[in-house]
From Swiss-Prot:
Residues 622-658 form the UVR domain. ATP binds at G39, A40, T41, G42, T43, G44, K45, T46. This is UvrABC system protein B. Forms a heterotetramer with UvrA during the search for lesions. Interacts with UvrC in an incision complex. The beta-hairpin motif is involved in DNA binding. One of its GO terms (molecular function) is ATP binding. The gene is uvrB.
């Protein structure tokens, strides 16, 4: 079993990194349960965490608050650990409409989902890796705290095959059907097997290129080969192979029988309750739907929406914590929560939102009450899974600070760049003042970000600046994903000099060309002007050697005072370090493609523009969409998840436009 992490990088830790690595490693070895790394923007937090993982050498779960960020982290960790198992576990839905019921209009919305086959493969690859080795890093979104099948069943049902093993061909085929593999001798793909005489070829659920060829001599396995599924080329001989189930909700036949008995008993009890309350329509609906599912489970071993019966399938009592990805890890694993100030509130909030929707389905006879146990973890349940955890954020939240107030700091950037200078100027005359600042930046070929509090203010300011001859664009929540990416790219290319927006904190706006961030109405306390938001917004000017922040305000709020104080404290530390080591700050030279695969995404959008869809015939349009879908799948195969996500969003927009 491979169990050593091997970090591969041409860089060595610089600035604050060696001290942060040393402190985090010492804390983990001392048995500290919670640690927080306060890492300023651009200080190389991922590299620090990678060094800690190598030093501590334990299986690691890295959680991010969305798929895009998880994709970026996956690419980075994959580069740092090319010889280890770096895996990706996010929701496999390209599109997901959960099952719901709206009583006001008596509308039942059926679950509708488009599953991304590539991400499903990576999820299987992640769980399989945890059973086979210890040098595993799994990058996951918050969806990893959602219910998953039992790891005990999953592990017990794997089919282990060795050369010389006595097993008949038909016994193997039955075992494969039990773990939800389909026989298909023509369309051979993931999760399927095909049979040719004494040769069985199995396409593991965690692969998409290589299959396993099992050759029999009588009732004995004579040879196992790894084969390229497309060309038939022999990749190599294998002495042993483990075939993991094709579904995480796989169940042994004896357990399935018990589960069906329990589901029938629950159905009977629930029907009595509904009829006693004179809810006859609900009772009829529930009986019809559940009996159909039971019939499918008895005949096929699964049904659509089988996860709603997961409590029965794992023989758990009501209310007991569901199994999740966290249960697949060994007991001594460590967690890393990236952007913890956003991710932890997400973890806390997922349970309540899920229960509210499902309770409605239960009340109106669409689901049995046991469906409520197919759910994400509560915060306290999540905490029980923690062995050791590291929170990573430029602005740690109250949860992290409460768990361990001793924060480890990483303030110094390897590039020598400083936190920006912050100025406060009066609101009166702010637009004229801002105009002078913009002209000054344009002359130096630098860019400006302006953040306002309201949509109307943003629109009015954008129109005013346009009339004044400024190359400006407005970025708001209604701008579609691809347009947003293109606007950011165009800012970097100089098509625009200024971007005006409300919330400029979203990932992908770390732009080296931006030397000025202007914050209007900085003294209006609230979510967008809180201490954390202000620090994050100021950080947008921290990638340029001339970085400056101007706050327009008539009074000093606590949030302003604290955020300015924190920025000045960091700046002082950075200046002292640079002077001591003779470092001159230099603006980061970052290729234009660097913003969430912006180039390819914007190019893709150009392709859409050039092919005016409204002028296409239905056939031409279908061919064009098919081509984009192929591109999306190829991007996912190449592990370029950011590009795949952008293409997916473009496709959804095209389809929505009819």
């Amino acid at each position: 079993m491979k169990d050593k992490f091997e970090l591969v990088s041409k860089y060595s830790p610089q600035g604050d990194q060696p001290r942060a690595i040393e402190q985090l490693v010492a804390g983990l070895k001392k048995g500290l349960k919670h640690q927080t790394l306060l890492g300023a923007t651009g200080t190389g937090k991922t590299f620090t965490v990678s060094n800690v993982i190598q030093e501590v050498n334990k299986p690691t779960l890295v959680m991010a608050h969305n798929k895009t960020l998880a994709g970026q982290l996956y690419s980075e960790f994959k580069e740092f650990f090319p010889n280890n198992a770096v895996e990706y576990f996010v929701s496999y839905y390209d599109y997901y409409q959960p099952e719901a019921y709206v009583p006001q209009s008596d509308t039942y919305i059926e679950k509708d989902a488009s599953i991304n086959d590539e991400i499903d493969k990576l999820r299987h690859s992640a769980t399989a890796a945890l059973f086979e080795r210890r040098d595993v890093i799994i990058i996951a979104s918050v969806s990893c705290i959602y219910g998953l099948g039992s790891p005990i069943e999953y592990g017990e049902m794997l089919v282990s095959l060795r050369v010389g093993m006595e097993i008949s061909r038909d016994q193997l085929l039955r075992k494969l059907v039990d773990i939800q593999y389909d026989r298909n001798d023509i369309d051979f793909q993931r999760g399927r097997f095909r049979v040719r005489g004494d040769v069985v070829e199995i396409f593991p659920a965690s692969r998409d290129e290589h299959c396993m060829r099992i050759e029999f001599f009588g009732d004995e396995i004579e040879r196992i080969r790894e084969v390229d599924a497309l060309t038939g080329e022999i990749i190599g001989e294998r002495e042993h192979v483990s075939i993991f189930p094709a579904s995480h909700f796989v169940t042994r036949p004896d357990i399935m029988k018990k589960a069906i008995v329990n589901i029938k008993a629950e159905l009977e009890d629930r029907l009595k309750v509904l009829r006693a309350d004179n809810k006859l329509l609900e009772a009829q609906r529930l009986e019809q739907r559940t009996n159909y599912d039971l019939e499918m489970m008895e005949e096929m071993g699964y049904c659509s929406g089988i996860e709603n019966y997961s409590r029965h399938l794992s023989l758990r009592p009501a209310g007991v914590t569901p199994y999740t990805l966290l249960d697949y890890f060994p007991d001594d694993f460590q967690m890393v929560i990236d952007e913890s100030h956003v991710t932890m509130p997400q973890i806390r909030g997922m349970f309540n939102g899920d229960q509210a929707r499902k309770q409605m389905l239960v009340d109106h006879g669409f689901r049995l009450p046991s469906a409520l146990d197919n759910r994400p973890l509560r915060l306290e349940e999540f905490e029980k899974h923690i062995n050791q955890i590291m929170f990573i954020s430029a602005t740690p939240g109250p949860y992290e600070l409460e768990k361990n107030p001793d924060v480890i700091e990483q303030i110094i950037r390897p590039t020598g760049l400083l936190d920006p200078i912050v100025e406060i100027r009066p609101i009166q005359g702010q637009i004229d003042d801002l105009m002078d600042e913009i002209n000054d930046r344009v002359e130096k070929n630098e860019r400006v970000l302006i953040t306002t509090l309201t949509k109307k203010m943003s629109e009015d300011l954008t129109n005013y600046l346009k009339e004044a001859g400024v190359k400006v664009q407005y970025l708001h929540s209604e701008v579609k994903t691809l347009e947003r990416i293109e606007i950011i790219r165009d800012l970097r290319l100089g098509v625009y000099d200024v971007i005006v927006g409300i919330n400029l904190l979203r990932e992908g706006i770390d732009l080296p060309e931006v030397s000025l961030v202007a914050i209007l109405d900085a003294d209006k306390e609230g979510f967008l002007r809180s201490e954390r938001s202000l620090i994050q917004t100021m950080g947008r000017a921290a990638r340029n050697e001339n970085g400056r922040v101007i706050m327009y305000a008539d009074k000093m709020t606590d949030s302003m005072r604290n955020s300015i104080g924190e920025t000045e404290r960091r700046r002082k530390i950075q200046i002292e370090y640079n002077e001591k080591h003779g470092i001159t700050p230099k603006t980061i030279k970052k290729e234009i493609r660097g913003i969430i695969a912006a180039t390819s995404a914007a190019d893709e959008r150009e392709a859409v523009k050039q092919h005016d869809l409204s002028k296409m015939s239905k056939k031409e349009r279908d061919v064009f969409i098919e081509g984009m879908e192929h591109e999306m799948k190829e991007a996912a195969k190449a592990l370029d998840f950011e590009r795949a996500a952008e293409l997916r969003d473009a496709l959804l927009e095209i389809k929505a436009e009819g």
